[in-house]
Design a protein with these regions (language model features):
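N-terminal helix-turn-helix DNA-binding core of bacterial DNA-binding proteins
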Residues: 12-55, 70, 77-89
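Residues in the helix-turn-helix
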Residues: 58
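Amphipathic alpha-helical dimerization/coiled-coil segments
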Residues: 1-17, 38-39, 87-109
Length: 109
C-alpha cells in the first residue's frame, strides 16, 4: 500500500482487534514461537519449548495468551497438543516482518 492510499479512518473500526494482536506479539518469546509456527506449520508443545528455549510451563502461558487473541489454535493427539497459526493474516504479518527486518539488504532508513 502506498502512503498516499493510507486511510486511518478505515483502521478505526478494527483498532481494538489490531491492538490486541500487537499486544499479544509484543514479546520476544511470543514472536519466536509464532515464527516457528509459521516455519513449521504445526508443532508440539515439547518441540516448540525446545526451539524457543522455554520450559513447557512458561510456553503454555505464552500459548494461552496467543490462543485468547485467536492467533494460535491446537489439536490434541493422544496426550500431545499440536499448535498452529489460527489466522492467515498472522502468517502474512510475519512474512511482512521478515521482509522488513530479516532480509539482509533491508536497512533502517
Amino acid at each position: 500500500m502506498a502512503v498516499k492510499d493510507f486511510k486511518p479512518s478505515i483502521l478505526e473500526a478494527q483498532a481494538a482487534e489490531v491492538a490486541g494482536v500487537l499486544r499479544a506479539i509484543a514479546n520476544e518469546r511470543r514472536l519466536m514461537i509464532l515464527c516457528k509456527l509459521v516455519e513449521w506449520r504445526e508443532a508440539s508443545v515439547s518441540s516448540l519449548a525446545d526451539a524457543v528455549g522455554l520450559s513447557q510451563s512458561a510456553l503454555s502461558q505464552h500459548l494461552a495468551k496467543m490462543r485468547s487473541e485467536g492467533l494460535v489454535a491446537y489439536r490434541r493427539e493422544s496426550q500431545t497438543l499440536w499448535y498452529r497459526i489460527a489466522d492467515a493474516r498472522i502468517e502474512r504479518l510475519f512474512a511482512t516482518l521478515h521482509r522488513l527486518f530479516c532480509v539482509t539488504n533491508n536497512k533502517r532508513r
